[in-house]
Amino acid sequence: MLQLLAILVAASLIAVGVLLYRTGRLSGQTYKPPEGHDTISVEDVVTAYQVLEAELIDAVDYYIESYTAWADRESPIDARFLVKSCILYDVDIRMVLAQARVESNLGVSGMAVKTNNIWNVGVYDGKTHREIHDGYRFKTPALALLAYLDLLKRRYLVTRSELEVMTDFVDVDGRRYATAQNYELQLMSIYIDMCKHTNLGVLWLETRGLYQHMRMVLEHPEKHVGKSR
């Protein structure tokens, strides 16, 4: 299953490149954004997305390095892969980072150091260290991220937004992600702190929004693309 996920995401990451390339091929034409925004060239849309994504990757990398500066090891989270995966799965990167902090201090504490299971997917109270090590170990942190994002989309973010889930972290069957009674409070405290003291929120919303609009350009070019004057 995880190998299949890895293949799917690898293909999706390639698809991002193809999306940028195909959008860029619409040279000499203009992109018509939502009402209230100026019409700009398709080339500028591609450039804007690449710049925004790069800024978001840098901001995430800085956030991870700053938070784990106290640790005796570097966080195993790759900022570039994290950003691209969150964009493709359409999951708020602030939620992902908040859970990574609560579950394993961004991968530098607890069993995650040995299992790569940064978000503790499948790890429940009562399981022994041996059970966790043997049954919930991932070959790489990237595979752990994919399993986590897949779980969120299948079981938690089905009919609710990220904020709604973080205030009541139960799945479609009403089962909690964690047994800690203050789990949601911890997540929201970190989330709010990120919104107040970093530019992650602004960069995330702009990057995700522009990516989604680029997809619409390709799916319905007759609505969004016209000849330049």
Regions found by a protein language model. Give the residues of each.
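Catalytic cores of secreted/periplasmic lytic hydrolases that degrade extracellular macromolecules
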Residues: 2-229
